[in-house]
């Protein structure tokens, strides 16, 4: 069995894994133990009261966090004509059609988000086997297939997070960086949970948001008392 590092021993001693902490206390604990030499991400895991085996209970969407994610996001847009100009003005990093598709086929994928106008899906559709496994395939459910590409670019650049439950019915995403203030992290988390509540499937029964835990890149998970949000 691997030995625990001094940091992990300190975290285990300082965090009660059986306790749900008041949100401000939970975030203070996270920041206390975020001692990596880089600016750690603050991640959240939300256990949902859904049956992920049923397609009509799967939760997928996107929302813009009020304080962003702290990440610089590179955006590629498949579009043409006036939409291409609008995407450029909105701050898109890469814009094209067949030429951009050829770059993707060559493995040149220096971007984090892919957006497409509906007329470009005939080109993007050919890239499903490349973009799909990387979670980059545009999808109207998360607003990345849209006639308003400029708005989608602005959302991506301003701190939009996409979410999708895993096979255990858990949403994993980020709500910022350890350098954010506790208030910024709290407001980002509240915005995410509000978006999830709106995305509740009509067929989901009982308690929808069952458990919320926050963690940093190299830290332990801290369960949050939802009544404090």
Curated annotation (Swiss-Prot):
Subunit field text: Part of the 50S ribosomal subunit.
Tell me one GO biological process term. translation
Which gene produces this protein?
Answer: rplA
What is the documented function of this protein? Answer: Binds directly to 23S rRNA. The L1 stalk is quite mobile in the ribosome, and is involved in E site tRNA release. Protein L1 is also a translational repressor protein, it controls the translation of the L11 operon by binding to its mRNA.
Q: What is this protein called?
A: Large ribosomal subunit protein uL1
Cellular component terms per the entry's GO annotation:
cytosolic large ribosomal subunit
Q: Name one Pfam family in it.
A: Ribosomal_L1
> Which keywords appear in this protein's UniProt record, sorted alphabetically?
Repressor, Ribonucleoprotein, Ribosomal protein, RNA-binding, rRNA-binding, Translation regulation, tRNA-binding
């Amino acid at each position: 069995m691997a030995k625990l590092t001094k940091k992990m021993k300190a975290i285990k001693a300082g965090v009660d894994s059986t306790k749900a902490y008041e949100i401000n206390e939970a975030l203070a604990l996270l920041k206390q133990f975020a001692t990596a030499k880089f600016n750690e991400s603050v991640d959240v895991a939300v256990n949902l009261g859904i049956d992920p085996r049923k397609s009509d209970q799967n939760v997928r969407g996107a929302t813009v966090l009020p304080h962003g994610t702290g990440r610089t996001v590179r955006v590629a847009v498949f579009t043409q004509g006036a939409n291409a100009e609008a995407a450029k003005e909105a701050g898109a990093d890469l814009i094209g059609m067949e030429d951009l598709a050829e770059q993707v086929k060559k493995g040149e994928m220096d971007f984090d988000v892919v957006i497409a106008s509906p007329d470009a899906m005939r080109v993007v559709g050919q890239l499903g086997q490349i973009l799909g496994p990387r979670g980059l395939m545009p999808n109207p459910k998360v607003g990345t297939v849209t006639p308003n590409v400029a708005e989608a670019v602005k959302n991506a650049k301003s701190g939009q997070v996409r979410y999708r439950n895993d096979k255990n019915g858990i949403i994993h995403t980020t709500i910022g960086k350890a350098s954010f203030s506790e208030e910024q992290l709290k407001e980002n988390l509240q915005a995410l949970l509000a978006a999830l509540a709106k995305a509740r499937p009509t067929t989901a029964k009982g308690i929808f948001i069952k458990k919320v835990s926050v963690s940093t890149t190299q830290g332990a998970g801290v369960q949050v008392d939802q009544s404090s949000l």
